[in-house]
């Protein structure tokens, strides 16, 4: 009854408690968190009204902000509080709140539409941006994280970034909006790995090791056990446990970046050729302990950001790579630099919850050397052991590296705002060739992930 009442009066009340997010060429607000949360609002009304214009509006907002401010790796956009015209370089950042709200919206858009685009985008943010915004032990986070970020300190970097204050340090007492909000990131992600489908089946929409109990077919309860180290591994394995034989469709998302994906059921290859960017469906009678294996080959690829000085990013499957920068962690008193409205608990022991500032111990101002005809021909992927603590998002623990060649760009330095300066021009003088190492940008709390480059 409530739902039908809303449908009948939708035109009158849709914007009563929020702004109008259906404008075709402008946004009602340029705050990163508002955008990450509210772009899904029209699609929510589409679920009640069936008006396809509402669904189209949500897609439009997602694309609109990225056409200008999101020409960077990591899945987000430059809005270090608010997006500002002229501030589109990858040294602009986004709030940790914005990262997890984007993930949550992607997950809800996935549920509303079934479009694999939203699963893939959620993975891009989850693997490449969110992990670097927090300390490995989750006892501190920074308000702003950028695709190119070579300092993480307690200084005020305005107007290099939009907001005024100590927003780049890993401070557990400061920026309480993010302290509360970021904890939704991984739990909501886990919640949306395995989804029900309208035909009484089940879909593996996003990938991570998990166990799920679901109802399929005529209401039969089964469990799925997923085993993988994805996105650091190409193979994902599922075990189906069911008390009796049951028929249902099992959907597997095939990412758009893979070529030659293969699926095996109980060791036998499924005949169909899975299409990248779509779902593969296995519709059969399932028995207890049936095994499903999907292999998603990963290759090196490159994106060019033309509006940002033709900078490039290097991807390996769903992972975007960043320069490996040795990090110097400096412990600080969290109370000394927390912003005024933080209001931490009175009995909080600052010695147990220190702030960390992070500084570069090795040079960061490299251009990538690309091949003229085959840009990535000299790039080599190196696989390392899986970390003993099961946390792959640090410089020391990441199990994947890429060896490459770089040249230093002497003019690319820390600027007057104590930030990594904007990308240099393509013809900026460069130094001698050096071997450099790239690591997944989610493991790099200091990072260069959009590179100047030279083709040789």
What are these regions (language model features)?
Residues 58, 119-128, 133-241, 275, ...:
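C-terminal beta-rich recognition modules with glycine/proline-rich loops and embedded aromatic residues
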Residues 1-8, 12-13:
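Single conserved hydrophobic/aromatic residue that forms the stacking wall/gate
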Residues 4, 30-47, 94-110, 179-189, ...:
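Well-ordered alpha-helical segments within folded domains of soluble proteins
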Residues 47-68, 89-139, 149-150:
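Catalytic-core region of carbohydrate-active enzymes that cleave or remodel glycosidic bonds
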Residues 258-283, 302-307:
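Solvent-exposed beta-strand/loop surfaces of large extracellular or lumenal domains
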Residues 248-251, 282-297:
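C-terminal beta-strand-rich structural cap/linker in extracellular carbohydrate-active enzymes
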Residues 245-265:
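Beta-strand-rich binding/interaction modules
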Residues 228, 240-244, 253-256, 284:
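Non-cytosolic beta-sheet module surface loops
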């Amino acid at each position: 009854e409530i739902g039908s009442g809303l449908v009948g009066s939708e035109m009158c009340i849709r914007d009563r408690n929020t702004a109008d997010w259906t404008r075709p060429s402008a946004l009602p607000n340029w705050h990163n968190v508002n955008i990450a949360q509210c772009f899904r609002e029209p699609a929510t009304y589409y679920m009640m009204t069936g008006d396809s214009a509402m669904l189209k509006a949500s897609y439009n907002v997602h694309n609109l902000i990225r056409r200008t401010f999101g020409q960077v790796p990591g899945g987000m956009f430059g809005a270090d509080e608010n997006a500002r015209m002229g501030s589109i370089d990858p040294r602009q950042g986004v709030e940790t709140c914005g990262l997890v709200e984007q993930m949550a919206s992607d997950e809800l858009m996935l549920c509303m539409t079934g479009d694999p685009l939203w699963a893939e985008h959620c993975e891009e943010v989850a693997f490449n941006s969110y992990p670097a915004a927090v300390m490995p032990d989750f006892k501190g986070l920074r308000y702003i994280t950028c695709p190119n970020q070579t300092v993480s300190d307690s200084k005020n970097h305005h107007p290099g970034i939009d907001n005024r204050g100590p927003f780049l340090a890993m401070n557990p007492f400061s920026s309480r909006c993010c302290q509360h909000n970021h904890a939704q990131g991984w739990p909501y992600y886990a919640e949306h790995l395995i989804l029900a489908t309208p035909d009484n089946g089940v879909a593996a929409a996003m990938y991570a090791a998990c166990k799920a109990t679901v109802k399929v077919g005529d209401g039969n309860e089964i469990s799925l056990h997923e085993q993988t180290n994805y996105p650091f591994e190409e193979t994902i394995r599922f075990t189906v446990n069911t008390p009796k034989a049951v028929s249902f469709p099992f959907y597997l998302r095939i990412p758009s970046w893979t070529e030659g994906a293969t699926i095996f059921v109980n060791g036998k290859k499924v005949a169909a050729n899975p299409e990248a960017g779509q779902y593969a469906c296995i519709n059969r009678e399932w028995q207890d302990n049936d095994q499903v294996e999907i292999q998603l080959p990963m290759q090196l690829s490159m994106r060019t950001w033309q509006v940002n000085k033709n900078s490039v990013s290097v991807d390996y499957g769903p992972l975007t790579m960043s320069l490996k920068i040795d990090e110097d962690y400096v412990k600080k008193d969290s109370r000394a630099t927390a912003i005024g409205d933080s209001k931490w608990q009175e009995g909080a022991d600052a010695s147990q919850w220190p702030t960390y500032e992070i500084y570069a111990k090795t040079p960061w101002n490299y251009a990538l050397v690309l091949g003229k005809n085959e840009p990535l021909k000299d790039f080599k992927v190196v696989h390392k052991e899986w970390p003993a603590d099961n946390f792959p998002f640090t410089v020391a623990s990441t199990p994947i590296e890429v060896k490459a060649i770089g040249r230093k760009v002497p003019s690319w330095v820390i600027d007057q705002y104590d930030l990594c300066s904007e990308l240099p021009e393509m013809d900026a003088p460069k130094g001698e060739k050096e071997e450099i190492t790239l690591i997944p940008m989610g493991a790099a709390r200091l990072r260069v992930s959009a590179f100047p480059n030279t083709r040789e």
